[in-house]
């Protein structure tokens, strides 16, 4: 009886080599990963690689680790994950690439009327992944044929969160994107995908939610059973994502890292039940750090100082973005919360 049981267990644990999934720095499929691209002026390193170094973690790592190479390598986590997008045998795949600052190689133009939101969906009929990120001009369209890192994205810090998901979770993501109103600059959603994912098809046509409520949250379950919660708002929501909704929804104070170099920055807010503090300095653990100011960091994330929530997304805290779509993806994974909580070195008081 032992042999059949062993075979059954192996079948349940086996992941096909070509399964669409987030891929880690190890070169193997992972349930989720976070890549934190470091600012060019932080830490040490040879000049040619300035702005291409990154920190990495997934469900198997013990906190932050140095990236295995450089962010522009096709052999690192981000390059491996996006590789199927650029392969010729992608006829059975569906994908959406969206960015309010699309690559120059695409025909799309920057649009302040669309959501301030950036991401990648890549899937087949079994599932795929959602990559939520902060990187302008990224990634290059599928027709480019190869993964690359945009030169404009070397200077400042950036975050990328990838989650592997079964197909059943993509209708929920489609709903969320009708709220965030993304600028889709490249996509393929044909046949069975268009039939089963009608909201995503509407998104590719530039459609969005037409009636209240102007915000939406959806629970998503990763391929390995990790729970994430997506928060999305349309422009007519008319308020800051963090102080106007997220803190109350999560029931916690928040420390928020965002791009502070744009006009109309919203100050730290202690007027409500929960405090929203703007992060001013970020530092990685260890003697080499590095530590850097928020003015050098284009990433968008927040953490509950007392736990257990951490969120990675694509929205800043400024007046303009109170009237734009966007969102964030949150989780209560203890290791991920601990990793981000340790990054906060200073906040602007109320």
Swiss-Prot record:
A GO term for molecular function: deoxyribonuclease II activity
Family (UniProt): Belongs to the DNase II family.
Primary location: other
Enzyme class: hydrolase
Enzyme active site: 298
Glycosylation sites: 89, 215, 269, 293
Compartments, as annotated in UniProt: Lysosome
Function description: Hydrolyzes DNA under acidic conditions with a preference for double-stranded DNA. Plays a major role in the clearance of nucleic acids generated through apoptosis, hence preventing autoinflammation. Necessary for proper fetal development and for definitive erythropoiesis in fetal liver and bone marrow, where it degrades nuclear DNA expelled from erythroid precursor cells.
One Pfam family from the record: DNase_II
Disulfide bonds: 22-162, 270-350, 311-330
GO cellular component annotations of the record: lysosome
Expressed in which tissues: Ubiquitous.
Gene Ontology biological-process annotations: apoptotic DNA fragmentation; DNA catabolic process; enucleate erythrocyte differentiation; regulation of immune response
Catalytic activity: Endonucleolytic cleavage to nucleoside 3'-phosphates and 3'-phosphooligonucleotide end-products
Residue ranges the record marks as coiled coil: none
Protein's name in the database: Deoxyribonuclease-2-alpha
Signal peptide boundaries: 1-19
The protein's Enzyme Commission number: 3.1.22.1
Keywords: Apoptosis, Developmental protein, Disulfide bond, Endonuclease, Glycoprotein, Hydrolase, Lysosome, Nuclease, Signal
């Amino acid at each position: 009886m032992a042999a059949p049981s062993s075979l059954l267990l192996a079948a349940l644990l086996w992941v096909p080599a070509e399964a669409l999934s987030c891929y880690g720095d190890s070169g193997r499929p992972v349930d989720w990963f976070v890549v934190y691209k470091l600012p060019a002026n932080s830490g040490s390193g040879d000049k040619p690689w300035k702005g291409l170094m990154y920190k990495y973690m997934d469900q198997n790592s013990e906190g932050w680790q140095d990236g295995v190479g450089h962010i522009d390598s096709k052999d690192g986590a981000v390059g491996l994950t996006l590789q199927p997008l650029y392969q010729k045998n992608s006829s059975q795949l569906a994908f959406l690439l969206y960015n309010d600052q699309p690559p120059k190689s695409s025909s799309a133009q920057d649009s302040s009327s669309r959501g301030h939101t950036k991401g990648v969906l890549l899937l087949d009929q079994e599932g795929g992944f959602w990559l939520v990120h902060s990187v302008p001009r990224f990634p290059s369209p599928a027709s480019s044929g190869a993964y690359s890192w945009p030169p404009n994205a070397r200077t400042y810090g950036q975050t990328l969160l990838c989650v592997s998901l079964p197909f059943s979770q993509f209708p929920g993501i489609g709903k969320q994107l009708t709220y965030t109103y993304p600028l889709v600059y490249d996509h393929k959603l044909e046949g069975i995908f268009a039939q089963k994912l009608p909201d995503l098809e509407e998104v590719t046509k530039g459609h969005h939610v037409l009636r209240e409520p102007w915000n939406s949250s959806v629970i998503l379950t990763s391929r390995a059973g990790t729970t994430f919660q997506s928060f999305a708002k349309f422009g007519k929501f008319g308020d800051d994502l963090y102080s106007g909704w997220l803190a109350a929804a999560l029931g916690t104070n928040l420390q928020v890292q965002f791009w502070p170099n744009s006009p109309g920055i919203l100050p730290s807010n202690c007027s409500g039940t929960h405090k929203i503090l703007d992060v001013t300095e970020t530092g990685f653990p260890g003697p080499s750090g590095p530590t850097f100011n928020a003015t050098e960091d284009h990433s968008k994330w927040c953490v509950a100082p007392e736990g257990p929530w951490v969120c990675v997304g694509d929205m800043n805290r400024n007046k303009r973005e109170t009237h734009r779509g966007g969102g964030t993806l949150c989780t209560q994974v203890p290791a991920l919360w601990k990793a981000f909580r340790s990054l906060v070195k200073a906040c602007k008081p109320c």
